[in-house]
């Protein structure tokens, strides 16, 4: 095995065993498989959520609301959330499951807590409709019924495209999917209503141009940051640990050989010589345990050579990287995640924090994480170095994935809940408003659908991100997730057009480039899927809109 092939294994035997288990995760397990109770539980939970929410929505929308459209919108909206869970959420947790840090069930639990919490706590109680966003509907005459048809068509088209991508294992942008659906439905409405010229003018083509730019900008930024970050981690932590462990293994073999050699030499001595040598060994054992021990006092060759071996062991500061570098990396990572939460995840909560307040919070969290990680590293002394490395990066990866999940829940669930909330608002008020209220009941229901989607159809995307694009371990998975979070945060502040999905895939590729183990062949269909996501959703939505206008 070459040095490069060896060096990228940051988890060694422990990580490899867990990786093999992750790689064997089945792509699909039927209802008769070992996870049958989980399948049944999520099926019942999904059905129960739909029934309870529909019952609540009938009362919320009022007696004058069209019940057929309300039920249809609920089904389509939950179906969209289901597919967002199978793609976006699976994409977010793919590195954690692929690295063996989390099992599928553990990832589901973390996603359920943090995704739903992010949606309910920080998702915002009001969402903007697309009236003047990617499509400006003010240029055409749109009545409430046609507006709902646009939203229904967009949700249906985006969900169907995501379902296809999930079945193929392609991580694609759910945001681009819903945007494509809205654009296609809006243009189709303009065409069928005889407003052809206005139909094309109402699309904000500069926004579409930014999406095209994001196809290149997002993976490049994610890959560049990940390449640099993981390069530092590998050079200063993983390679150092591997060299230290290799040296300790050599010293251990030397110690065993030393013992065997002296045992054989002792057996060759006469009985009188053995008695004398035993006395010398006993005196050396006492001397070696004194605080003021002087190596020159040793009488026996056994203890003199043993002292030299012990000196070699002491010269190998095996845990230096874990105590010096890992706390710094963990502190920097925690600061990035907290910054992403404060500036992106909590942006809908209007906490009233000043910029200086945010900076102090970020600094305090960074200091606390540095101290906690440093103490944790000290407690691991005496443990296997490879296992200690695996444990520390596993904790850091779970922390990063949890923060990413919360931020995702607070923002990207809007791809499903936004159009649905707009439909619900029109059914309740009979008018098209610039903003639509998002009831907490809808957030919880769609959160359940999100988690169910991760469980039922998320395995293929997890396999793609977790180990099909490149071999993933806790350190490399942490680097990919943290790089993606950092780029998303920076792009949000700078206003750059990026996609979090594309960024994370780029970050995974960056790790693979460092390890020279990137599956470029798999990237070809994934990039093609990115390019055709928007037009595919647009075509499906245009067909859906024509069908809905014919039915209703």
From Swiss-Prot:
<comment type="function">
    <text>Potential transporter for phosphate.</text>
</comment>
<dbReference type="InterPro" id="IPR001204">
    <property type="entry name" value="Phos_transporter"/>
</dbReference>
<feature type="transmembrane region" description="Helical">
    <location>
        <begin position="107"/>
        <end position="127"/>
    </location>
</feature>
<keyword id="KW-0592">Phosphate transport</keyword>
<keyword id="KW-0812">Transmembrane</keyword>
<protein>
    <recommendedName>
        <fullName>Putative phosphate permease Rv2281</fullName>
    </recommendedName>
</protein>
<feature type="transmembrane region" description="Helical">
    <location>
        <begin position="69"/>
        <end position="89"/>
    </location>
</feature>
<feature type="transmembrane region" description="Helical">
    <location>
        <begin position="326"/>
        <end position="346"/>
    </location>
</feature>
<feature type="transmembrane region" description="Helical">
    <location>
        <begin position="38"/>
        <end position="58"/>
    </location>
</feature>
<feature type="transmembrane region" description="Helical">
    <location>
        <begin position="437"/>
        <end position="457"/>
    </location>
</feature>
<keyword id="KW-1133">Transmembrane helix</keyword>
<feature type="transmembrane region" description="Helical">
    <location>
        <begin position="472"/>
        <end position="492"/>
    </location>
</feature>
<feature type="transmembrane region" description="Helical">
    <location>
        <begin position="389"/>
        <end position="409"/>
    </location>
</feature>
<feature type="transmembrane region" description="Helical">
    <location>
        <begin position="213"/>
        <end position="233"/>
    </location>
</feature>
<dbReference type="GO" id="GO:0005315">
    <property type="term" value="F:phosphate transmembrane transporter activity"/>
</dbReference>
<dbReference type="GO" id="GO:0035435">
    <property type="term" value="P:phosphate ion transmembrane transport"/>
</dbReference>
<keyword id="KW-0472">Membrane</keyword>
<dbReference type="Pfam" id="PF01384">
    <property type="entry name" value="PHO4"/>
</dbReference>
<feature type="transmembrane region" description="Helical">
    <location>
        <begin position="526"/>
        <end position="546"/>
    </location>
</feature>
<comment type="similarity">
    <text>Belongs to the inorganic phosphate transporter (PiT) (TC 2.A.20) family.</text>
</comment>
<feature type="transmembrane region" description="Helical">
    <location>
        <begin position="146"/>
        <end position="166"/>
    </location>
</feature>
<feature type="transmembrane region" description="Helical">
    <location>
        <begin position="178"/>
        <end position="198"/>
    </location>
</feature>
<keyword id="KW-1003">Cell membrane</keyword>
<keyword id="KW-0813">Transport</keyword>
<dbReference type="GO" id="GO:0005886">
    <property type="term" value="C:plasma membrane"/>
</dbReference>
<feature type="transmembrane region" description="Helical">
    <location>
        <begin position="493"/>
        <end position="513"/>
    </location>
</feature>
<feature type="transmembrane region" description="Helical">
    <location>
        <begin position="360"/>
        <end position="380"/>
    </location>
</feature>
